[in-house]
Each structure stands twice: as structure tokens, then as C-alpha cells.
Design a protein with these regions (language model features):
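Hydrophobic alpha-helical segments, chiefly the membrane-spanning helices
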Residues: 1-189
Length: 191
């Protein structure tokens, strides 16, 4: 439920805030490639959830489709010269510093997610509301905050395409990776 709510929050909240903040010019490739891929993943989730269960096979298909998408995306963009697009500060950073920040970010993300889930469960119990409702609403909005922050920073840095790409990529990864891998591990997920 959190994944569904997060994807809705990404489109409804994050994209709305971005649209209010600035004029977004979208390239043709977005309509021809990126948007249809997100739509395919969303429809795949819809079809797989018609029986209210995401099985291991469903998870395998979603994750395999994600791997195909990643391969397609990398091979499509490999031809572009990305050297000019790399931030100068990143080029000057040492591998040690990047690894340290990645480790700190990963640990912070893990514990932040733990606090978010524990807090949401406690809140649901105290308010006498189902955990599913809290998952689709409060937790989903909470998990969309990083996308909102990244999109706003992209707008400030004049990278408007990145702000929309961030949302599309997040929605695709929520379905293909988070839900796909979870279904592979847990066998059955009830939606």
C-alpha cells in the first residue's frame, strides 16, 4: 500500500509543487519513452494486484522488467557525452569521501525508515485507524519527501528535466525494485 500511495504522492504532491514552482519544459523523449515505461509498470502492478496478492512470480516479473528497463536506459544514454554534465565538485571528491557519504546516507535512510514505520504503526493504533490507511496516506507522503527535495534542488540548479525524471524513475523503481524484491522475499504480499 505504501508503494501505491508513494507513487500517487509523487505525481499528486511532488509534481504539483514542481509545476507551481516553475514552468516545466518536457522533451519529446519523455512522452515517447519515459512516460510509457512508467505507465507499463503501473499497469503491470494493477493487473498483478487484481487478485489482491502479489506473488513471487509477480515479483520476479516486476524485477526482471526493471532490469530490462535499466539495461535499456543505460544503453540508450551511453552514447551521450556525460562528461560535461558531471558536477565539478563531484569530480574533485575522493572515492573515500563519496563512499563515506554513501554509507552515512544508507544508514540514515535505514533508521529513518524504521522510525517512520514504527511511528506510523503507533499512530494508527492510537487513532484506531487501519495501518493500510496510514500506509497509503501519511507514510506515502513521508516517503515522497526525498523526491520533493531532490526535485526542488533540481529546479534551483536549473535542471528542470531532472525534477520530472526523478519522479518517473522513483515510481518505476518503487514498483520494480521495492515491490518486486519484497514479493520475491516474502512469497505473498496482500494488497
Amino acid at each position: 500500500n505504501n508503494i501505491i500511495g508513494s507513487n500517487i504522492a509523487n505525481i499528486g504532491l511532488v509534481l504539483s509543487v514542481i509545476s507551481i514552482s516553475t514552468l516545466i519544459v518536457i522533451e519529446k523523449s519523455f512522452y515517447k519513452k519515459d512516460w510509457p515505461i512508467m505507465f507499463i509498470f503501473t499497469m503491470m502492478l494493477f493487473v498483478f494486484s487484481l487478485d489482491s496478492i502479489i506473488s513471487q512470480l509477480d515479483g520476479l516479473v516486476m524485477f526482471a522488467c526493471l532490469l530490462v528497463f535499466i539495461y535499456y536506459f543505460i544503453s540508450r544514454n551511453q552514447q551521450k557525452n556525460l562528461d560535461n554534465e558531471i558536477d565539478e565538485k563531484l569530480l574533485e571528491s575522493s572515492g573515500y569521501k563519496i563512499t563515506l557519504w554513501l554509507l552515512i546516507s544508507t544508514v540514515s535512510l535505514f533508521y529513518g525508515a524504521e522510525f517512520l514505520v514504527d511511528g506510523a504503526v503507533d499512530f494508527a493504533k492510537k487513532m484506531n485507524v487501519s495501518e493500510a490507511v496510514i500506509s497509503v496516506s501519511i507514510v506515502a507522503i513521508g516517503t515522497s519527501i526525498p523526491e520533493l527535495a531532490a526535485s526542488l534542488i533540481a529546479i534551483i540548479k536549473k535542471e528542470k528535466g531532472l525534477s520530472v525524471g526523478n519522479i518517473i524513475g522513483s515510481n518505476i523503481f518503487n514498483i520494480g525494485s521495492v515491490l518486486g524484491i519484497t514479493a520475491l522475499i516474502l512469497s505473498l504480499i496482500h494488497i
